[in-house]
């Protein structure tokens, strides 16, 4: 047995919605991957930075993309920002990256996709969220009930 990072296999993390990990949380998926490695191989098996790297650069590598996965000139500008000034992060800011992974934020403060701001101050800027949620829940009910 060996830790995933030592296996030589390209590893990427991702979610495609609430049906895939019961929460649609990419950071939750990063945390889960880290914890599973630590359970199997000890507390030093993976750091928060390594787990986040699987979700960013690792995801790009798995997709054979060299234009995503990092913030650098010439790369697609996709990133999120979290406000660490909340009670959930109290006492954890000596390592903000680990705080982000272990404290599992419940919402994104800012999200930029392909250079376009889609979440600002925690609110979607691109859609009418109540309308989308109503439609989503209607479709979900129909799917479950067989309507």
Protein language model features and the residues they cover:
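C-terminal cap of metal-dependent C-N hydrolases
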Residues: 76-133
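Short, solvent-exposed cationic patches
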Residues: 133-147
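Generic structural signal for well-ordered, non-membrane alpha-helical segments
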Residues: 23, 48, 52, 125, ...
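Residue-level recognition of short, well-ordered coil/turn positions
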Residues: 8-9, 116, 147
């Amino acid at each position: 047995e060996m830790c995933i990072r030592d296996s030589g296999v390209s590893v990427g993390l991702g979610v495609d919605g609430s049906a895939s990990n019961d929460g649609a949380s990419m950071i939750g998926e990063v945390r889960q991957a880290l914890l599973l490695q630590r359970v199997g191989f000890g507390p030093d098996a993976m750091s928060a930075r390594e787990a986040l790297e699987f979700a960013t650069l690792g995801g790009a590598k798995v997709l054979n993309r060299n234009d995503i996965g990092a913030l650098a000139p010439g790369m697609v500008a996709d990133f999120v920002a979290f406000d660490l000034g909340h009670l959930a992060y109290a006492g954890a800011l000596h390592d903000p990256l680990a705080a982000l992974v272990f404290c599992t934020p419940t919402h994104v403060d800012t999200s930029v996709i392909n250079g376009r701001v889609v979440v600002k101050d925690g609110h979607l800027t691109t859609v009418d969220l109540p309308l989308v949620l109503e439609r989503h829940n209607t479709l979900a009910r129909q799917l479950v009930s067989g309507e």
